[in-house]
Curated annotation (Swiss-Prot):
Family membership noted in the UniProt record: Belongs to the universal ribosomal protein uS19 family.
PANTHER family for this protein: RIBOSOMAL PROTEIN S19P FAMILY MEMBER, SMALL RIBOSOMAL SUBUNIT PROTEIN US19M
Record flagged with keyword Ubl conjugation: no
Gene Ontology BP term (one): translation
GO molecular function, one term: rRNA binding
Organism of origin: Bartonella bacilliformis (strain ATCC 35685 / KC583 / Herrer 020/F12,63)
Protein name from the UniProt record: Small ribosomal subunit protein uS19
Keyword Lipid biosynthesis: no
Pfam families named among the record's database cross-references: Ribosomal_S19 (PF00203)
Keyword terms, alphabetized: Ribonucleoprotein, Ribosomal protein, RNA-binding, rRNA-binding
CC terms in the record's Gene Ontology section: cytoplasm; small ribosomal subunit
InterPro entries with a match to the protein in the record: Ribosomal_uS19, Ribosomal_uS19_bac-type, Ribosomal_uS19_CS, Ribosomal_uS19_SF
Functional description taken from the UniProt entry: Protein S19 forms a complex with S13 that binds strongly to the 16S ribosomal RNA.
HAMAP family associated with the record: Ribosomal_uS19
């Protein structure tokens, strides 16, 4: 379900502060975040965020096309190993 327009995008408060600190310092460092639910804002373009996937932080470089999406969309939480091999084919 889509969020109401009048509410505006959701972003955790600490995230804006972290992004501003990195921009002010001028260093290109990974900003570790656990807030997968936060919306990517235009201020975040050009920064690299380490989005937690439940196990480790996945580095996500924010580009123009990502604005409006959620951080969690770019750090998958599940690993697909493929379906099991056919047992009949193995025996032959």
């Amino acid at each position: 379900m889509v969020r109401s327009v009048w509410k505006g995008p959701f972003v955790d408060g600490y995230l804006l502060g972290k992004a501003e600190k990195v921009r002010a310092s001028g260093r290109n460092e990974v900003i570790k975040i656990w807030s997968r639910r936060s919306t990517i804002l235009p201020q975040f373009v050009g920064l690299t965020f380490g989005v937690h996937n439940g196990n480790k932080h996945i580095p996500v470089f924010v580009s123009e096309e990502m604005v409006g999406h959620k951080f969690g969309e770019f750090a998958p939480t599940r690993t697909y190993y493929g379906h099991g091999a056919d047992k009949k084919a193995k025996r032959k």
